[in-house]
Amino acid sequence: MKSKRAFTLIELLVVIAIIAILAGLLLPALSRAKAKAHASACLSNMRQIGFAHRFYTDEHDGEFVQLTKAVRPPPDAILPWGNTWWPDLLQNALGRNTQIHSCPSLKDPKSFGIGMNHPELGHYLETAWKVKESDIANPSTTVIFADSGLLKNPREKNPDKWVVDPKFKGPSVYFRTPNNEPWYTDSPHRIHNRHGLTANTAHVDGHVEAARTSSIGFQYPLGHPQAYWDRQ
């Protein structure tokens, strides 16, 4: 009766090499699939936020939600920061679901990472006037919510090259517009291409889409026909 032949060292090394090659081929594909799933989930969250804002606007005679109001936040506030911020102002439509306000691509859900257009559409504290839907010339092209973060290269002219500062650990719930200097440069919370070559965006009319940050027109001044961050 023949005895079973044991693997030689060379055969074992060949098997290990084959496994390593297969893993090298599969892992990038799995990583891309995971990133795509995160981007889709983020877009779904953005859609729910967009619908909630439409609901809020309808209930408030066409007025947009403010970035933050100078009123005490609710006991179960999503953002217990002293004032009441837009995620809590939209609680009637969304409920207290913190995951909706967070991009799944971020490791820490408390980073949120979905921001409101500020100050062009979302005002800070109380102002003499409110932004209303009737103020928006092109609701279908005007971005109100999007992937946001604090940049480490705010003086970069090409928005597609903006990179989030890895040292920043705080939440990001707004993105600044170019008419918000000096804070636009000094505290550069902005839209960025979090999902490969695109950022997820929600528009005033309620629709959502993935778009390059450069296509939103942050390289253009207020009033430019390709500045899709302003009201004009």
Please identify what each model-predicted range represents:
Residues 40-232:
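Short, well-structured segments within or immediately adjacent to enzyme catalytic domains
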